[in-house]
Each structure stands twice: as C-alpha cells, then as structure tokens.
C-alpha cells in the first residue's frame, strides 16, 4: 500500500473540511442574501416603532447580514387593515400586526390574544403558546391562509381614553367606542356601547372631531405619543386587581408570506424565530419602561384616571363568558384554541362550574 506523507494527508484533510463546510446548511444559506419588507401596526414616532426598528437591526446581526428586514411604519405601504392581504399576495413579505385585527376573517385570532376576563398575564399566554399547543394551532390556521405565523409578541394591557367620564358599568350605554373588534367589541356592545373599528392612526382625529366618545388603543406610552391626552381628559381602567377588564395582554405577532418563508433556508428560519422570541420580551420591557415615564405626563396634562369597581367587573364577566363560547364555535381552530385555554383557566381557578353552567362546546 502506498504511504501518504503527513503533508499530503493534511492537505487532503483541509480540502475535505472545506468541501464539507461548503455544503453545510449555514454555507448554503450564505450562498444568497434575503431582503424582506415588513410593515408594523406601530405608527412612526412612537416608542413601539422605535423598538420595531431595533428588531430589524437585530435580525441582520443574528443572521450575519444574510437576512435584512426593511421596516415600514403603519400605513407606509398599505393601510393597517390591508396588511393581511398585502402579505398574502406578496406586496409585503411580512407584517407585525395586533393579531386580533383579523378576527373578522379568522375567528381563531380572537383566541390568539387576550379577551375580556380570560387569561390576563403575559406568562400565562407564553405558557399556552409554548407549552399547551397554542403555537401549533396558530401556525396551522395561518398556513391555510398562505401565511406563516412566526410567534406572538408581548406588548401591554390596553386602556380606554374618553372625552366623557365613565365611572360605572352602566355609563358605557350609548358611548361611541373604538375597540379592536372580535369578542371585545361584542362584550362592549352587550353593555350598550356603540363600537367602531379604527386603526391607531385614525383614533386621535376621530376623538378630536367627536366621531367617537372614547377609544381603546394600547397602553399609556404609545397613546401619549399619539396625543390622546390632548383630546380625551379621562382614562378608564378596572380596579387594581383587574386593571384592564377587556384586553389585559394585547398580543402582536410576526406573520410572513408562506412562500417567502419556505424559500428561506432552515438555519435562517431558526434564527428569525429565535429573534422574534427574544424581541417579544424586549418589546414588552421597552413598552413598560416607557409607560412608567408616561404616567406623570398625563397627570401634568390634567387627565383623570377613573377606576371601575369590582362590581363592574362582575357585570362585564356575566356578559363575557357566554360570548367566549359563541366565538369558540365559529370554526375548528377557535374551538381547539378555546378548549385548551378553558382547561387551563379551570386549572388555575379562573372560572367556576357555576359560571359555566349551561354552556358547552
């Protein structure tokens, strides 16, 4: 047998390693670069949009520049409520919406974010998505629409800004109220309010002109950025133990055109998923910090914070629970999502047998 010199062996070994590296998944991903256009629901000039821009920089960093995301604020390419179709048809590669916006066309999205008096803490929603099957339900439902649901993005509780004082449950009767739709709209409608769906950028002028009397839209920091304190001198919240009766965990998400997603090499898919999960908590923490800085500004602007009572919460709860079940029956994904959430709520003592009497899936 012919002997191979040490030098020749090392030379061949180097060639082999180089060849192996050249055909590794990461090297294949490096063979081309990808550029996505993603629009968020956050308006330019808000803390939310600033955080979104930082996320796009982080994606580039985590993918070594192989995936670049061009960020767009709300309305820059298409209207906020047109993002779904824009991503589906490829006008945009992806979106960062408030998930609940699609409840009218995908009822399950009403269960992919918090609803009146259901799960009310960010960690509970993380548990449901990542340990109780929620992420799988979301991805299967969105795949049928030609979309890939990457994951939820933690955000904030929602507060209501009002031009008139609302001091008890009965005061909602006749109020023209902007809400995000879905079950939340039905609960307020059952309480006697007249509900309207508007994107965030249209809330200020609607309040200013008196088109609406009050508006739910995210939390104090972004709402201050949008100038709500200038046109509405009341903020309506629940009691301390239930500060947001209607939407305590207002989740956003990242959704990508399914073909664009499938064209992305798996190593880059994994890094983007990791970036979204990381961003979820960075986004949440950034919003909370900004909220703490915003509250004193409301006081300086003369805005009064009104807290509803525990009795008001009980009245909303009596309206809300039957509406949960109504929405759960709208399609198979809604039923599957709510069934698992209901078991979770039972397990942590959030609902009683008495409250569920006569209701079934």
Swiss-Prot record:
The lineage of its organism: Bacteria, Thermotogati, Deinococcota, Deinococci, Thermales. Residues 1-22 form the signal peptide. Its main location: periplasm. InterPro entries: DctP_fam, SBP_TakP-like, TAT_signal, TRAP_DctP_sf, TTHA0766. Ca(2+) binds at residues 158, 216-217, 247. This is Lactate-binding periplasmic protein TTHA0766. It comes from Thermus thermophilus (strain ATCC 27634 / DSM 579 / HB8). GO terms for cellular component: periplasmic space; tripartite ATP-independent periplasmic transporter complex. Belongs to the bacterial solute-binding protein 7 family.
């Amino acid at each position: 047998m012919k002997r191979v010199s040490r030098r020749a062996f090392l030379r061949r070994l180097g060639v082999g390693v180089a060849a192996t590296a050249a055909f590794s998944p990461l090297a294949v991903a490096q063979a081309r670069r990808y550029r996505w256009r993603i629009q968020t629901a956050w308006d330019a000039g808000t803390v939310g949009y600033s955080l979104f821009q930082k996320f796009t920089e982080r994606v580039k960093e985590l993918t070594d520049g192989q995936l670049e995301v061009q960020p767009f604020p709300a309305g820059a390419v298409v209207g906020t409520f047109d993002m779904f179709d824009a991503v589906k048809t490829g006008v945009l590669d992806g979106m960062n919406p408030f998930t609940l916006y699609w409840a009218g066309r995908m009822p399950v999205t009403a269960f992919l974010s918090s609803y009146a008096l259901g799960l009310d803490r960010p960690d509970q929603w993380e548990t449901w998505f990542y340990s109780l099957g929620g992420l799988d339900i979301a991805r299967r439902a969105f795949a049928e629409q030609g979309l890939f649901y990457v994951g939820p993005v933690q955000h904030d509780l929602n507060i209501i800004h009002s031009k008139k004082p609302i001091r008890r449950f009965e005061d909602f009767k006749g109020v023209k109220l902007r809400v995000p739709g879905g079950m939340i709209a039905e609960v307020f409608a059952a309480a006697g309010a007249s509900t309207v769906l508007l994107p965030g950028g249209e809330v200020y002028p609607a309040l200013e002109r008196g088109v609406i009397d009050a508006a739910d839209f995210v939390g104090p920091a972004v709402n201050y950025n949008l100038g709500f304190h200038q046109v509405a001198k009341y903020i309506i919240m629940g009691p301390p133990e239930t500060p947001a009766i209607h939407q305590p965990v207002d989740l956003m998400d990242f959704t990508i055109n399914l073909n664009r997603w499938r064209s992305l090499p798996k190593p880059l898919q994994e890094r983007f998923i990791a970036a979204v999960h990381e961003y979820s908590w960075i986004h949440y923490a950034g919003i909370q910090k900004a909220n703490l800085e915003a509250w004193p500004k409301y006081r300086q602007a003369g805005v009064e914070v009104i807290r509803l009572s525990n009795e008001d919460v009980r009245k909303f709860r009596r309206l809300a629970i039957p509406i949960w079940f109504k929405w759960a029956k709208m399609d198979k994904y809604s039923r599957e999502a709510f069934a698992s959430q209901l078991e979770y709520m039972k397990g942590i003592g959030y609902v009683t047998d008495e409250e569920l009497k006569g209701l079934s899936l």
